[in-house]
Amino acid sequence: MRSLQIFAFALGLCSADAYLVTPPGTPAPGAASGCSEWVQASYGLTCDIIHRFYGMTDAEFEEWNPSVSQLGDGCNLISDLYYCVQVNYVPETPTWTPPATTTASAGNGVTTPTPTQAGMAKDCNKFYLVVSGDSCYNIATAQGISLDNLYAWNSAVGSSCKDLWPDYYICVGVISGTTTSPPTTTSATTTTTTVGNGVVTPTPIQTGMSTNCNKFHLVVKGDGCYDIAAAAGVALNDFYA
């Protein structure tokens, strides 16, 4: 029976399914056809890490990637395969017809484009029209705001971006200007040269940092590993390595 399961799983790797967004490599067999974002399994990456950093439940991850529960107990990843971490849901048809023209939000004097989802911040003064394939993280990064801000200003989107609707406007800036910007690379004032590689290394640093590092980030309160890696343009796996 075990050999039949492995044979069936291998056949799944050879199947050519169509996806909403094509993965850059081999997808895990059975991955959701509506997948719009992928992560590659590599050494040190676990299902739990994926759940936490992409804001999903165990059940959602298994639903989008049924193969993780087919190779033994618990959640199992196969190195180098791509796993689905986001699915673009088709929004339900609204029961009302959005107006064709823009309207002024009551009280703040800012003209608000339509349609918008319910629960948008009343003091919003900057808007973005969502298109198919967008993700909350990509929008927040492009607009220079944090995911926390995006979720706070657009409560209908949900805390995992599951209800982000294409062709609707969301808020990406407010009048008060109280935003949390994505982390930026900052050099410490005191520096010392790392032995052997000739690169000036800022201090203080944590032990175990790569000896051939040539780019640094000063961690501030509220930083997360995923946000730092994304802002610096490096893979989360490289960051942990």
Swiss-Prot record:
It is found in: Secreted. SUPFAM superfamilies: LysM domain. Disruption phenotype: Leads to enhanced fungal virulence, with faster decaying on infected fruits. The LysM (lysin motif) domains are small globular domains involved in binding chitin in eukaryotes. LysM8 contains 3 LysM domains. Secreted LysM effector that might have a role in sequestration of chitin oligosaccharides (breakdown products of fungal cell walls that are released during invasion and act as triggers of host immunity) to dampen host defense. In plants, chitin acts as a microbe-associated molecular pattern (MAMP) that is recognized by lysin motif (LysM)-containing plant cell surface-localized pattern recognition receptors (PRRs) that activate a plethora of downstream immune responses. Belongs to the secreted LysM effector family. This is Secreted LysM effector LysM8.
